[in-house]
Regions:
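C-terminal structured "cap/appendage" subdomains that terminate the fold
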Residues: 193-260
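Conserved blade-register residue in beta-propeller folds
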Residues: 24, 70, 118, 165, ...
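Conserved beta-propeller blade repeats
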Residues: 1-11, 38-56, 88-107, 134-153, ...
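Cap/lid segment of the alpha/beta-hydrolase catalytic domain
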Residues: 11-19, 28-33, 227, 262-268, ...
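A flexible loop/linker signature enriched in serine peptidases of the S9 family
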Residues: 12-21, 36-40, 56-67, 76, ...
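Multi-bladed beta-propeller domains
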Residues: 15-17, 24-42, 58, 71-92, ...
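Structured, non-catalytic alpha/beta "coupling" segments that mediate domain-domain communication
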Residues: 148-155, 160-161, 241-272
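C-terminal substrate/ligand-recognition segments
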Residues: 154-156, 188-206, 292-301, 340, ...
Length: 365
């Protein structure tokens, strides 16, 4: 929806090739505009004045997303302005909007290298500004934090990533970047959200997802406690940069999905939604986390769930694992395993290598 809340943009794909047609609807008049933008990505971003949209387009032969255009509402697609084109087919392009709603980020990425450009939402036809030129084995992303930009970066062999502060002048020299949260061998940083006075970090510690809060006022970094030994979580529905709280999803092998709200100032945690599961009583089940030795003597974490009172030595077990593409196998709620548990099975999830459960090295090794 446009910033003035008058227009809605949406994408249609009728071929299955993920080449979308963007259409624009006037919400007050309840009718479609004549604008039709074909063979593009569906994630368009509005300019601040609601007069332009910025979108990505794929190469017609390779289908690699490699072009960024600006479209003026009410004009033909042939008049759209090309503002960036990537010539290296190893890189893919995608768009993102800053949490402050001031910038559009253009990300150019491949597996081990990235580059970010800034576009001012107040001036979508203006010049792009490079954050930091791409280099081999350097992955970074940025977020606006008001007075500064903040970057997640693996610069200088920080495989588990660190958080760095960037002055809004001179950030094209990485020597000017200031380390805020140092790289830790025990913590793999996956995501961050900037707020007016805080940064919320989603990390992994010993293979388990955690949330940490960095307070600008005293430079403290504190972890939020969770109720279960193993679980799954994720940051959700946090669009307001000036908010005093954030929301996150949570579930475990014995806790049905829920959404919680965490107050950044008084450090309170409240459940605001929970999925009701018929005939499921969480206190009937037990969850544990163990580690087992692989053939090369590496400890592999395994989460298990079973019904209380079960004879574990003689019970059958169903074990699940997937290790590829850095995909994590977290211990979230699975209603499909309840019948097995009630019949005396143990269910286990192994966090095998190939995922990034234990950090970047877990994937690379």
């Amino acid at each position: 929806i446009s910033p003035d809340e008058n227009l809605l943009i949406y994408g249609e794909d009728f071929t299955g090739r993920r080449e979308y047609t963007l259409r624009i609807k006037d919400l007050h008049k309840n009718k479609l505009l004549d604008d039709e933008i074909v063979k593009v990505s569906p994630n368009a971003i509005w300019s601040s004045d609601s007069k332009y949209i910025v979108y990505a387009k794929k190469d017609e032969e390779t289908l690699i997303q490699n072009q960024i255009y600006v479209h003026e509402i009410g004009t033909d697609q042939s008049e759209d302005k090309l503002i960036y084109k990537e010539d290296d087919n190893e890189f893919n392009i995608w768009l993102s909007e800053s949490r402050t709603k001031k910038y559009i980020y253009i990300y150019i990425e491949k597996t081990d290298s990235s580059e970010v450009w800034l576009l001012d939402k107040d001036n979508p036809l203006g010049n792009l500004e490079l954050v930091l030129k791409r280099s081999e084995n350097h992955l970074y992303s940025i977020e606006d934090g008001g007075d500064y930009f903040y970057a997640l970066s693996n610069y200088d062999d920080a495989k588990n990533f660190k958080v760095m502060r960037l002055e809004k002048d001179g950030f094209q020299n990485i020597n000017n970047w200031e380390e805020v949260i140092e790289v830790r061998d025990t913590h793999y940083i996956e995501d961050m959200l900037t707020f007016n006075e805080f940064i919320v970090i989603q990390s992994r510690y010993d293979g388990i997802p955690i949330i940490e809060v960095f307070n600008f006022a005293n430079n403290s970094l504190n972890q939020i406690d969770m109720k279960d030994e193993v679980y799954d979580l994720g940051l959700v529905y946090n669009n307001n940069f000036d908010s005093s709280f954030f929301r996150y999803s949570y579930s475990s092998l014995k806790t049905s999905p829920q959404i919680l709200k965490y107050d950044l100032y008084d450090n309170t945690n409240n459940v605001i939604w929970k999925k009701q599961v018929n005939n499921f009583i969480d206190t009937d089940y037990e969850i544990k986390r163990i580690k087992t030795l692989a053939r090369d003597d590496t400890n592999v974490p395994v989460s298990i769930v079973y019904k209380k009172g079960l004879d574990l030595k003689n019970a059958p077990m169903l074990i699940y694992g997937y290790g590829s593409y850095g995909i994590n196998m977290d211990s979230g709620f699975r209603s499909t395993i309840t019948p097995l548990l009630n019949r005396g099975f143990i269910f286990a999830i192994a966090q095998i290598r190939g995922g990034a459960d234990m950090g970047r090295y877990w994937y690379e090794d």
